[in-house]
Structures are given as structure tokens and as C-alpha cells.
Regions:
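Conserved pre-motif I regulatory segment
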Residues: 1-28
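Interdomain helical connector at the RecA1-RecA2 junction of SF1/SF2 helicase-like NTPases
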Residues: 3, 181-294
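Walker A/P-loop
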Residues: 20-44
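Conserved Walker A/P-loop ATP-binding site and its immediately adjacent core
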Residues: 33-38, 53-76, 301-304
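Conserved helicase ATPase core of P-loop NTP-dependent helicases/translocases
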Residues: 96-99, 297, 307-308, 318-355
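SF2 helicase catalytic motif II
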Residues: 111-113, 125-170, 175-177
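A short beta-strand element within the Helicase C-terminal
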Residues: 132, 347-351, 355-373, 378-385, ...
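A conserved SF2-helicase RecA2
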Residues: 219-228, 377-380, 388-425
């Protein structure tokens, strides 16, 4: 069953899709609040009553982890509500599309794999241009990226030519790319016709007379124990300790104050990452977390820093996991499974940014950010790893440890609502 705020989004979105063929919209919900489950219920309703159990669904994501999570959610919903035996088609990695009959199928595809397949096989492109009911894009804030944008427009245009325009549904906790006015932000809003649906806080407050009224989505869900509340515990390191020049400090400040995706100079990042005093303080805190059995996801400054911290943990007989972009998928899954196992001694997962999306572990007790973060998207994704509350299998409170560089960003409420003013609400 859906919770009231999920049901309300489902009701509003289905009503919107029924008003016009080929309607497009984006669902904006916090990480851990059930975006995927809500989308699956929407698919079930539309497939049964609007698509007459015909045609097929296309679910797109950028990573294998996201696709596997989506399949698990679909199976759970379909087991209880499905009107017919839908066929699951996997299209990523070693999985290929073989059956030409797509009627009654839901295709879970990586964007890279689907695009490569459609380029080399004209017949596949013709097949997918017939009977496509709805395209769902998980983590859709990435949709403006050139290749993804081209793929979506190609699918929408081809189906338009064939006479039936599919609906387009985006899912994200961060409905923007950079600072709101960037070209990619504009492309994102245009792709979804500037339509964004989220949690109706005013309506939900009326459903909860026993609670004091919440001012925003995050506060509402925290009061309901759906999201966890953060206990902030910063590590304060002075500029003198980092031994940065005035020019380097100014570079960081300008990057942190920028509305866009301005990055801190890589040489400065390396200098920060190699600072012995800084790393000593970080490791002392990690030792303490591990000794207390606190499940921690650690975001390093760069790849070299991640390897250094992981090696130091290992040398001190701490069972940590290291996950980088180059990590083999089988080894990555093994480490993630070990981390998720509460009986395992693996309490710390070290990465740079790989685990910002496609990683779902309700048992995270601590998010540790050691790098200067200049992107509101990246920052939101990082803190989102630990935001799942007790009603969603997580914790009532989550520790958030940041180095002082990241404190220029506001709290989780500010981060979630950052892009609202750029959309037609």
C-alpha cells in the first residue's frame, strides 16, 4: 500500500496524464521517501486502465544498481496489483534483448546499452517505436546530458511519427543540474514540459492533526519517521593547518559560493587530500566510528585519497570496503552486501562519488563527507544516502560528519528545495 503523500502524487499525476496524450512530468521526492514505489503504482494503474494491458513500458537508469532496485520494486507491486503476467526484460551489461514481441513487457534498460543497441540495429528501433506506453527515467536530473537527451528525444519523436506519443515520467530528489539558469537546467525543464509534482505539505498537514504543522517536505517526513534527522558533527580544520595560500583559499570560497558547478582546482584538492594533520583527524574519527559499530559511508577527496584512507584503515585491522569507478561489478556487489549485513564486521565503505546514486542501504548510521563539495546536486545526493527513516527500514537519526569546507551549504531542507523557484509549481 502507498502512504498518503505517495497516493496523492499518484492521483494527481494519473489525472494529469489523462488530460492529454503524451503528457510529460517529473516527480520530485526526497531520497528514501518512496519515489520508485510510487512510480510502480502509477505504471500499474495506467497499464491496467489506460493502456488496456497492451503495449510495453521502458524504465531507464544510468546504473545496474538502480535497475536491480527498480526490478525488485516492480515485482513487489506487481505481485499484489498486477492485472496480467508482465514480462521483465533486462537490458544492461551482459543482458540483451532477444524477443521481438514486446507486448506486455517492461524493459529495464541502461541508457548506454539501449542507445548502443538502437544505433546498430534499425529493426530494434522500429520495434521500440511501436506500442511504447510510457518512458520512466530514474535519476532524471541526468537527462540533459547530451547522449541521454538525444535518446529520449529520438524515442519521443519516432513514437510521435508512428501516431502514439508515450508519456514521459522523471524521478529525482534533485530537479536540476547546476545553478538553475544553466543551459542544462533549462533543457531539463523543457524535456518535462516544466511540470514538477511533489509532496503537498499543506494537504498532508491536514491529515496529521496530532502533529504540529510542518513547513516543508523534509520536516514533514522527519516528523513521520519516514526520513531520519541529521546530527551534524563537523571536523573543523583551519586554513593554517591546510597550508593553503590566500589565492587557493579564495578559489575554494568562490567555488562554494557559485550557483553553478564550478569545481575546486584539482591541485588544491590534492593538496587538501595529502595533508597529514587533516587525514590524522579523519582517521581518528573513522577509528571511533568503527569501534562503535557505526555503519559509515565515507566520501573521499579524490581517488588517491580514497585509496590512502582505505589502506590506513586496513593497516589498522579495520574491515573497510573501497568502491571506485574502476571496481568490478561483482566485487562491488560483494562489498555492498557485506556492508548491508548488520552481522558483518564491514562498517565503513570508502568511495569518491560512485555511491551517490544507485546505492540503497537503510542501515547507514553515518555519512562522512571529507571533500570540498561545490555542487548542490552532489551534496544532496551524498546526504541522501543516510536519510532513510525508521518507517522505511532506516534510523531515526543519522550522524553527518563534514569537514569545514562543506558548511557553506544549508541543511537538508534547503538542499531539497533549492530548485523549486525555477519550476512552474
Amino acid at each position: 500500500e502507498l502512504l498518503d503523500y505517495q497516493y496523492d502524487i499518484r492521483r494527481r499525476l494519473i489525472s494529469f496524464y489523462r488530460e492529454q496524450q503524451g503528457a510529460r512530468s517529473l516527480i520530485h521526492m526526497p531520497t528514501g521517501s518512496g519515489k520508485t514505489k510510487t512510480a510502480m503504482h502509477i505504471i500499474q494503474e495506467l497499464w491496467a486502465f489506460d493502456y488496456n494491458n497492451k503495449g510495453f513500458i521502458l524504465w531507464l537508469a544510468h546504473s545496474e544498481e538502480l535497475l536491480r532496485q527498480a526490478i525488485d520494486s516492480f515485482k513487489s507491486v506487481w505481485r499484489n496489483l498486477g492485472a496480467f503476467p508482465a514480462n521483465i526484460v533486462k537490458l544492461w551489461g551482459e543482458f540483451d534483448w532477444e524477443d521481438e514481441n514486446l507486448d506486455g513487457c517492461i524493459i529495464f534498460a541502461s541508457i548506454q546499452k539501449l542507445q548502443a543497441m538502437l544505433k546498430r540495429n534499425q529493426k530494434s528501433l522500429e520495434l521500440i517505436s511501436q506500442g511504447l506506453n510510457i518512458i520512466v527515467v530514474d535519476e532524471c536530473h541526468k537527462a540533459p546530458a547530451t547522449k541521454t537527451h538525444e535518446l529520449l528525444l529520438d524515442l519521443l519523436i519516432r513514437n510521435n511519427i508512428s501516431g502514439k506519443i508515450p508519456n514521459l515520467l522523471g524521478l529525482t530528489a534533485t530537479p536540476g543540474r547546476k545553478g538553475g539558469y544553466d543551459v542544462e537546467d533549462i533543457k531539463l525543464r523543457m524535456l518535462f514540459d516544466n511540470v514538477k509534482l511533489g509532496i503537498d505539505v499543506e494537504l498532508m498537514n491536514k491529515y496529521e492533526p496530532g502533529y504540529s504543522s510542518a513547513e516543508n517536505e523534509i520536516e514533514l517526513l522527519q516528523k513521520r519517521k519516514i526520513l531520519s534527522a541529521f546530527d551534524r558533527d563537523p571536523i573543523k580544520i583551519s586554513a593554517e593547518t591546510l597550508n593553503l595560500s590566500p589565492v587557493e583559499i579564495n578559489n575554494i570560497k568562490k567555488s562554494l559560493q557559485s550557483d553553478g558547478e564550478r569545481k575546486v582546482n584539482a591541485e588544491i584538492i590534492s593538496k587538501i587530500a595529502n595533508n597529514k594533520t587533516r587525514n590524522k583527524l579523519i582517521l581518528e574519527r573513522l577509528f571511533e566510528l568503527n569501534n562503535n559499530g557505526i555503519k559509515t559511508i565515507f566520501f573521499a577527496c579524490n581517488v588517491a585519497h580514497a585509496k590512502l584512507i582505505n589502506a590506513a584503515l586496513r593497516l589498522n585491522n579495520i574491515d573497510s570496503g573501497l568502491i571506485l569507478g574502476e571496481t568490478a561489478s561483482t566485487f562491488r556487489r560483494k562489498q555492498i552486501d557485506g556492508f548491508k549485513d548488520d552481522s558483518s564486521s564491514l562498517n565503513i565503505l570508502v568511495n569518491v562519488s560512485v555511491l551517490t546514486t544507485g546505492f540503497d542501504s537503510p542501515n547507514i548510521d553515518c555519512v562522512f563527507i571529507s571533500r570540498p563539495v561545490t555542487s548542490i546536486i552532489l551534496y544532496s545526493q551524498m546526504i541522501g544516502r543516510g536519510i532513510r527513516g525508521p518507517r522505511m527500514g532506516g534510523n531515526e537519526r543519522c550522524k553527518l560528519i563534514e569537514v569545514v569546507d562543506n558548511l557553506d551549504f544549508g541543511d537538508e531542507c534547503w538542499a531539497f528545495n533549492f530548485f523549486d523557484s525555477y519550476w512552474s509549481l
